């Protein structure tokens, strides 16, 4: 079982969404990014998740020196299909695994999400991208 698979149901049970996990060298830093669908993550939310995960990781005998829990930030990564569905209408930046017309990086407005592809309005042109070809995707913050 992966660490993501271990933590996701626990975090979901607390009313949060597990966005991403970063690990430095084994046994060092474990960074967990969580979000809420109905609002911004607060410091109290991060503390609650951190306390709960600390106990879970001890029980599961997961080796780490330091646990950090934080929000994914304004430019949060989009990883799952549900992330894309949630942010239809928002500006995003994507990087492709395999170039499309010689280009791997695109910026545009997310207009539609299908079962295995998404539509992005890039400079007035609708372009379709397969979800499996996405290397990275992030929201572009509204400032």
UniProtKB/Swiss-Prot annotation:
**Any idea where this protein resides?**
Cytoplasm
One record GO biological process: ribosomal small subunit assembly
What UniProt keywords apply to this chain's record, in alphabetical order? Cytoplasm, Ribosome biogenesis
**Which SUPFAM superfamilies does the entry mention?**
YhbC-like, C-terminal domain (SSF74942), YhbC-like, N-terminal domain (SSF75420)
Give a single Pfam family match: DUF150_C
Q: What is its main location?
A: cytoplasm
**GO CC entries:** cytosol
CDD domains xref list: YlxS_C
Tagged with keyword Nucleotide-binding: no
**Its function?**
Required for maturation of 30S ribosomal subunits.
The entry's family comment says:
Belongs to the RimP family.
Which NCBIfam families does the protein's record reference? PRK00092.2-1
Name of the protein this chain belongs to: Ribosome maturation factor RimP
What is the organism field in this record?
A: Nitrosomonas eutropha (strain DSM 101675 / C91 / Nm57)
Q: Which gene encodes it?
A: rimP
């Amino acid at each position: 079982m992966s660490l993501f698979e271990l933590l996701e149901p626990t975090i979901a049970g607390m009313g949060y969404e597990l966005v991403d996990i970063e690990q430095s060298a084994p046994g060092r830093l474990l960074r967990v990014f969580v979000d809420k669908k109905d609002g911004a993550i607060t410091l109290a939310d991060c503390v609650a998740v951190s306390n709960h995960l600390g106990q879970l990781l001890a029980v599961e005998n997961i080796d780490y020196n330091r646990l950090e829990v934080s929000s994914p930030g304004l430019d949060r990564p989009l990883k799952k299909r549900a992330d894309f569905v949630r942010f239809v209408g928002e500006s995003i930046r994507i990087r492709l695994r395999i170039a499309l017309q010689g280009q791997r990086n695109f910026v545009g407005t997310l207009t539609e999400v299908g079962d295995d592809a998404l539509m992005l309005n890039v400079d007035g042109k609708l372009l379709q991208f397969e979800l499996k070809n996405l290397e990275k995707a992030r929201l572009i913050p509204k400032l």
